[in-house]
């Protein structure tokens, strides 16, 4: 995996995957899409879709654990704080050899800079929430979210997927 290349790709994902509008029905459709993908692939994950301060969709796929729920919460907090994907923040910290605690004073008990939480952005409004998956390796969590966003927004996933391992 090339960190710089992944960061460039994530920036394109974040710029491209923008909703024209977002409401509870869209959140349900997005969460349901993620659940369908997870069930079809046998992924034991937690799925959380929320605007900041308001949960709109939550589901566990059989085999997901309370740890997955906590990781989803902590990754979502990173999106709420930085308005960027948790994977992008984690990769930037990895490049710098730093942690959220030492660079930003954010406690690990509340924030996790691992892949899987992605900003929900609305045209003309900016980032208004997050969609999070937890249960796979972090790159897999991130890509599952991106794939579902592509499906919901009508983008070809192959053009936005991260490349390499």
From Swiss-Prot:
Record InterPro entries: PduO/GlcC-like, PduO/GlcC-like_sf, YBR137W-like
Coiled coil: none
SUPFAM superfamilies: GlcG-like
Source organism superkingdom: Bacteria
Family: Belongs to the UPF0303 family.
UniProt protein name: UPF0303 protein BMA1246
Taxonomic path: Bacteria, Pseudomonadati, Pseudomonadota, Betaproteobacteria, Burkholderiales
């Amino acid at each position: 995996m090339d960190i710089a290349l992944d960061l460039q790709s994530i920036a394109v994902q974040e710029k491209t995957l923008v909703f024209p509008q977002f409401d509870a029905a869209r959140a349900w459709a997005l969460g349901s899409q993620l659940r369908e993908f997870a069930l079809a692939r046998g992924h034991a994950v937690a799925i959380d879709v929320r605007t900041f301060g308001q949960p709109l969709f939550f589901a566990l796929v059989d085999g997901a654990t309370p740890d997955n729920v906590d990781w989803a919460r902590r990754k979502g907090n990173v999106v709420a704080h930085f308005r960027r994907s948790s994977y992008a923040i984690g990769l930037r910290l990895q490049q710098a050899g730093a942690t959220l605690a030492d660079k930003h004073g954010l406690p690990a008990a509340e924030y996790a800079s691992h892949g899987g939480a992605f900003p929900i952005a609305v045209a003309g409004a900016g980032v208004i929430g997050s969609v999070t998956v937890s249960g796979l390796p972090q790159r897999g969590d991130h890509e599952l979210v991106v794939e579902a966003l592509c499906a919901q927004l009508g983008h070809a996933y192959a053009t936005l997927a991260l490349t390499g391992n």
